[in-house]
UniProtKB/Swiss-Prot annotation:
Residues 429-436 are annotated as: G1. Residues 202-212 have a biased composition (Low complexity). This is Translation initiation factor IF-2. It comes from Mycobacterium leprae (strain TN). Keywords: Cytoplasm, GTP-binding, Initiation factor, Nucleotide-binding, Protein biosynthesis. PANTHER family: TR-TYPE G DOMAIN-CONTAINING PROTEIN, TRANSLATION INITIATION FACTOR IF-2-RELATED.
Length: 924
């Protein structure tokens, strides 16, 4: 192969895969990128030598290789095999009779080839003069003796060509007539029939019979020695003598062609040849074939298994929204919450544009990089036969920590390293049932008075000592809000607890938040101890409470159940010690409360807020390990180093053991309430984990807050809609979260929308005011105030700031504001009817209708509609003028005649004018 060659061409030539060729080139120090790259001629030569000295098809004697395979497969001699193949080809073309063909005698006699021959110009250049001897002595084939050959009939004493024809069959077979591929008078594609009789020997200017096919010739095949010369064969030679078998990259009729094959083409052009030159017997050869294969091949190559598989998969692919998408085998695809179509396409090896088009046709308009909701991903996956699993936050966080070799939620070490820890108890129940009063009594502190409106709006964590059987035991209490707006905070408290105390007022009974607290505790598989409070009040009925709670699976021990009921009075202090003993007994009997205090600390952030002097402050509950000063800690998307720890009494501590609630100072930002925290080796790891969690949270928020618009609703979505933008600021993260969820749960109407554009912990700053001014938002401050400059800026910009101390007041005000933004609803109120009796035309005012009021009243400037035969002719007309007896009047009542103009000309006698007014209706 002259010049450069591509890797995949060399692979086909050598009969190996492209990967093997690339690997061999890399071993030789030739770094090639891909199978389509080219290599220089010396590199290609070394590559062929490295594969056992394999050479191109023309150089290694393609005829010899093909003849070996055919002789071995059929068990016949070479001559019989070639004769049978040629006979079959001639018979298949219907050549039953043979006749001599007149051709141009100025050129050599060469049989035709089924494929296309070289151009006439190149043929004339490559055709050597007649009578020039060939410089390529023959090479003996296997199984044949190298006896000297007889002189050529037309050239005595001249050695034979490089490709002699087969010996005639016994009895003397007449020679076949070849055809000149350089002759324009002979069609290249038409086969030549066999002549019935041998032709006499030809002169250099005449046609010559096939070598070995002379009259009476029956001698052995001449031997072949040496290598063929690179030039073309002499005229009259049975084959072309190009050593590269038809050029650089094509397979022609050079060495390896059947007798009668034409010479090879010029620099890559296919040479002429006989039928199926070098291929299987009876197969029609083509002009060009695959590399490394001798002779011609069928024009249309066979498809590889990979191509067939791709075509089959394409036909079997499902059609979703008019787009053909990949078809899965039911495999599970795991996607993070808030994933995009690009993420999904990468998992299934699909084109993201196809997924976008499919969703668009289904009425869902998303981009390839936009976060998509869980339901959309699952629906799209089911249509494509994929089981899409949206990873839960816990599993997602576990996968996030795996690259850092970190785990959360498991105690490390052996059993002997586990130590008994205090139980964590959550006080739950309906609002105003006495939860905080009970905790006050236990702590001997007045916490309730500090809460606005007497309603707990934070999660408080405290640890108290209890004297049980002469030994002091510690119990950690978590106080959760009971208001309906704090559902998430109650659920968070249930997940972080060991035992739940359900406080139910004896005079009030089971309420909605009581049932919700039961559901949270049962969902978290937490044992429940029921405290029936306010037994000192009139109308208290503890037995009624026991009966009501039986419906929810809480059966008292008195009724044969396993739930402990304690009748208490938090105000007086009745049976408080019995309640604490019940908690400890339940913990000892039903739970194995042990933890490893020697490992790095892990736990949960109960509450967090932004302090003016201390910065972000987080109340954390250590669940396992020991938290120490100087530890690098990460909680949610916040990270930092522990600079200070304070217990519930405000005392600085150096270390916090399991089940200890402490305030941690040192975070770079405010953690979210309920975020898991853990200690890592260095600040760099903490920052990387926090950044990844922050990105994950943004994607999930974008997927949840994105408003879906279908094609059917596109027109209405483009219309102007009312939207109330809010900025929420609070004193701690839990309160802000609860306020946002409560506000987003307000159901008013589809015409108005509520959008929280920003939220944060701490006072209202100038940045908040600037954002509110740019987005026409209202700032809601919960237990926080605005700074002096922020107040002045808000006054100048006209930004409204609303302050609240009780959460339900904020909810009520926002709901009223949303209802005020609704478009008014108008109700039609019928005023009267007038019948047109006569028409008068005026050049000044147009047509005047002379009417009589048949019912009700007709007022000037009132809305009217024109009826003809009880069919509305036109609507939304206005009484522009109203007169009675030449006097302008404001209204005319029933039974009186009047004249009026409507600004409408299509009026006839007998028409009816119906007067009405639109009255705004109060929304429900």
């Amino acid at each position: 192969m002259a010049g450069k060659a591509r890797v995949h061409e060399l692979a086909k030539e050598l009969g190996v895969t492209s990967k093997e060729v690339l690997a061999r080139l890399n071993e030789q120090g030739e770094f090639v990128k891909s199978a389509s790259s080219t290599v220089e001629a010396p590199v290609a030569r070394r590559l062929r030598e490295s594969f056992g000295g394999i050479k191109p098809a023309a150089d290694k004697g393609a005829e010899q290789v093909a003849t070996k395979a055919q002789a071995k497969r059929l068990g016949e001699s070479l001559d019989q095999t070639l004769d049978r193949a040629l006979d079959k080809a001639v018979a298949g073309n219907g050549a039953t009779t043979a006749a001599p063909v007149q051709v141009d005698h100025s050129a050599a006699v060469v049989p035709i080839v089924a494929g296309e021959g070289p151009s006439t110009a190149h043929r004339e250049e490559l055709a050597p003069p007649a009578g020039q001897p060939s410089e390529q002595p023959g090479v003996p084939l296997p199984g044949q003796q190298g006896t000297p050959a007889a002189p050529h009939p037309g050239h005595p004493g001249m050695p034979t060509g490089p490709h002699p024809g087969p010996a005639p069959k016994p009895g003397g077979r007449p020679p076949r007539v070849g055809n000149n591929p350089f002759s324009s008078a002979q069609s290249v594609a038409r086969p030549i029939p066999r002549p019935p009789a041998p032709r006499p020997s030809a002169s250099p200017s005449s046609m010559s019979p096939r070598p070995g096919g002379a009259v009476g010739g029956g001698g052995p095949r001449p031997p072949r020695t040496g290598v063929p010369r690179p030039g073309g064969g002499r005229p009259g030679a049975p084959v072309g003598g190009r050593s590269d078998a038809g050029g650089g990259n094509y397979r022609g009729g050079g060495v390896g062609a059947l007798p009668g094959g034409g010479s090879g083409g010029f620099r890559g052009r296919p040479g002429g040849g006989g039928h199926g030159g070098g291929g299987r017997p009876g197969q029609r050869g083509g002009a060009a074939g695959a590399f490394g294969r001798p002779g011609g091949a069928p024009r249309r190559g066979r498809k590889s298994k990979r191509q067939k598989r791709q075509e089959y998969d394409s036909m079997q692919a499902p059609v979703v929204g008019g787009v053909r998408l990949p078809h899965g085998n039911g495999e599970t695809i795991r996607l993070a919450r808030g994933a995009s179509l690009s993420d999904f396409a990468e998992k299934i090896d699909a084109n993201p544009a196809a997924l976008v088009q499919a969703l668009f046709n289904l009425g869902e308009m998303v981009t390839a990089t936009q976060s998509v909701g869980d339901e959309t991903l699952e629906l799209l996956g089911s249509e494509m036969n994929y089981n899409v699993q949206v990873v839960s936050p816990e599993d997602e966080d576990r996968e996030l920590l795996e690259p850092f070799d970190l785990t959360y939620g498991e105690d490390q070490g052996d059993e002997d390293e586990l130590q008994v820890r205090p139980p964590v108890v959550t006080v739950m129940g309906h609002v105003d049932h006495g939860k905080t009063r009970l905790l006050d009594t236990i702590r001997k502190a007045n916490v309730r008075e500090a809460e606005a409106g007497g309603i707990t709006q934070h999660i408080g964590a405290y640890q108290v000592g209890v004297d049980l059987d002469g030994s002091e035991r510690l119990i950690t209490f978590i106080d959760t809000p009971g208001h309906e707006a704090f559902t998430a905070m109650r659920a968070r408290g249930a997940k972080a607890t060991d035992i739940a105390i359900l406080v139910v007022a004896a005079d009030d009974g089971v309420m909605p938040q009581t049932v919700e607290a039961i559901n949270h505790a049962q969902a978290a598989d937490v044992p429940i101890v029921v405290a029936v409070n306010k037994i000192d009040k009139e109308g208290a009925d503890p037995a009624k409470i026991r009966g009501q709670l039986t419906e929810y699976g809480l059966v008292a021990e008195d009724f044969g159940g396993d739930t402990m009921f304690i009748d208490i009075s938090a105000k007086v202090g009745t049976n408080i010690e019995a309640l604490l003993e019940a908690v400890l007994l339940t913990a000892d009997a039903a739970l194995d409360l042990r933890a490893n205090s020697g490992m790095e600390a892990q736990g949960v952030a109960i509450e967090a807020h932004l302090d003016r002097g201390r910065g972000p402050v987080a109340t954390v509950l250590v669940q396992r390990g020991t938290l120490r000063i100087g530890d690098s800690v990460v909680a949610g998307d916040a990270y930092g180093r522990v600079r200070r720890m304070v217990d519930e009494h405000g005392v600085d501590i150096e270390a916090a053991l399991p089940s200890s609630p402490v305030q941690v100072i040192g975070f770079t930002s405010v953690p979210g309430a309920g975020d898991n925290f853990l200690v890592v080796d260095e600040d760099r790891i903490a920052r990387q984990i926090a950044d990844r969690r922050s990105a994950r949270k943004r994607n999930a928020l974008a997927a949840r807050s994105r408003k879906r618009i279908s094609l059917e609703d596109l027109d209405s979505a483009l219309k102007e809609t009312s939207q109330l933008n809010l900025i929420l600021k609070g004193d701690n993260a839990g309160t802000v979260e609860a306020l946002e969820e409560a506000l987003m749960g307000i159901q008013v109407d589809d015409e108005v929308a509520l959008r929280v554009i920003d939220r944060g912990v701490g006072g209202i700053t100038e940045t908040n005011v600037n954002l509110a001014s740019a987005s026409d938002a209202i700032i809601i401050g919960f237990n926080v105030r605005a700074e002096g400059k922020a107040t002045e800026l808000a006054s100048r910009e006209g930004v409204e700031i609303r302050y609240y101390l009780v959460i339900y007041q904020a909810i009520d005000d926002i709901e009223k504001a949303l209802r005020g933004m609704l478009k008014p609803i108008y109700e039609e109120n019928q005023l009267g009817r007038a019948e047109i009796r006569a028409l008068f035309r005026s050049s000044k005012v147009g047509i005047i209708a002379g009417c009589i009021i048949s019912s009700g009243v007709v007022r000037r400037n009132a809305k009217v509609r024109l009826l003809r035969d009880n069919i509305v002719v036109t609507d939304n007309l206005t009484v522009t003028s109203l007169r009675r007896e030449k006097d302008d009047v404001t209204e005319v009542r029933e039974g009186f005649e009047c004249g009026m103009t409507l600004g409408y000309s299509d009026i006839k006698e007998g028409d009816v004018i119906e007067s009405y007014e639109l009255v705004e209706k109060q929304r429900a």
